[in-house]
Amino acid sequence: MAAGSITTLPALPEDGGSSAFPPGHFKDPKRLYCKNGGFFLRIHPDGRVDGVREKSDPHIKLQLQAEERGVVSIKGVCANRYLAMKEDGRLLASKCVTDECFFFERLESNNYNTYRSRKYSSWYVALKRTGQYKLGPKTGPGQKAILFLPMSAKS
């Protein structure tokens, strides 16, 4: 490949590619840093979800997995559990993937990401300034609590 050249890969069927990226682990593990209070989203092995400021906590290492375009599941690598939003807006970690474990991932204009529940479509993953999760019905666009910056969690 010559310096300055660009290589393109087929992405659409008419270009010789598939219609969508295959589901799977296509990203390196991440830490999700919340703008509100400076906490990292943490998934505990017992199913609890909260935020912690300690960068070395092993339970903040998360695997984001694409399920379809714009939709991800978030798995705690150490906890081996999936982030889920329940019907009352609580965040918890499930041992298996359910329809409550899928979130619309969106890059906002301020370069932070938001994670909105696919099942409860007006509710977001959010952390309060105390590090506790915020109930889904109390979240909405424009809140700092819903803004997350994905950071590398490579060892």
Curated annotation (Swiss-Prot):
Q: Which residues bind heparin?
A: 36
Q: Which InterPro entries match?
A: Fibroblast_GF_fam, IL1/FGF
* Crosslink site: Glycyl lysine isopeptide (Lys-Gly) (interchain with G-Cter in SUMO1): 95
What the entry lists under PROSITE patterns is as follows:
HBGF_FGF (PS00247)
Q: Residues annotated as region Disordered?
A: 1-20
Q: Which GO terms describe its biological process?
A: branching involved in ureteric bud morphogenesis; canonical Wnt signaling pathway; cell migration involved in sprouting angiogenesis; cerebellar granule cell precursor proliferation; chondroblast differentiation; corticotropin hormone secreting cell differentiation; endothelial cell proliferation; ERK1 and ERK2 cascade
Q: Where is this region: Heparin-binding?
A: 128-144
In which domain of life is the source organism classified? Eukaryota
The site feature described as Important for interaction with integrin is recorded at 128-129, 134
- Specify whether Disulfide bond is a keyword of the entry: no
Q: What keyword terms does UniProt attach to this protein?
A: Angiogenesis, Developmental protein, Differentiation, Growth factor, Heparin-binding, Isopeptide bond, Mitogen, Nucleus, Phosphoprotein, Secreted, Ubl conjugation
Q: How is it modified after translation?
A: Phosphorylation at Tyr-82 regulates FGF2 unconventional secretion.
Q: Name one GO cellular component term.
A: nucleus
User: Any idea which GO molecular function terms this record carries?
Assistant: chemoattractant activity; chemokine binding; cytokine activity; fibroblast growth factor receptor binding; growth factor activity; heparin binding; identical protein binding; integrin binding
State which residues form the propeptide.
1-9
Tell whether Magnesium is among the UniProt keywords. no
Pfam families linked to this entry:
FGF
Cellular location(s): Secreted; Nucleus
- What stretch of residues is annotated with the motif Cell attachment site? 46-48, 88-90
Where on the chain is Phosphotyrosine found, per UniProt?
82
Q: How does it assemble?
A: Monomer. Homodimer. Interacts with FGFR1, FGFR2, FGFR3 and FGFR4. Affinity between fibroblast growth factors (FGFs) and their receptors is increased by heparan sulfate glycosaminoglycans that function as coreceptors. Interacts with CSPG4, FGFBP1 and TEC. Found in a complex with FGFBP1, FGF1 and FGF2. Interacts with FGFBP3. Interacts with integrin ITGAV:ITGB3; the interaction is required for FGF2 signaling. Interacts with SNORC (via the extracellular domain). Interacts with glypican GPC3.
Which purpose does this protein serve, as stated in its record? Acts as a ligand for FGFR1, FGFR2, FGFR3 and FGFR4. Also acts as an integrin ligand which is required for FGF2 signaling. Binds to integrin ITGAV:ITGB3. Plays an important role in the regulation of cell survival, cell division, cell differentiation and cell migration. Functions as a potent mitogen in vitro. Can induce angiogenesis. Mediates phosphorylation of ERK1/2 and thereby promotes retinal lens fiber differentiation.
Its family remark reads: Belongs to the heparin-binding growth factors family.
Q: What is this protein called?
A: Fibroblast growth factor 2
The protein's organism comes out as Ovis aries
Gene that encodes the chain: FGF2
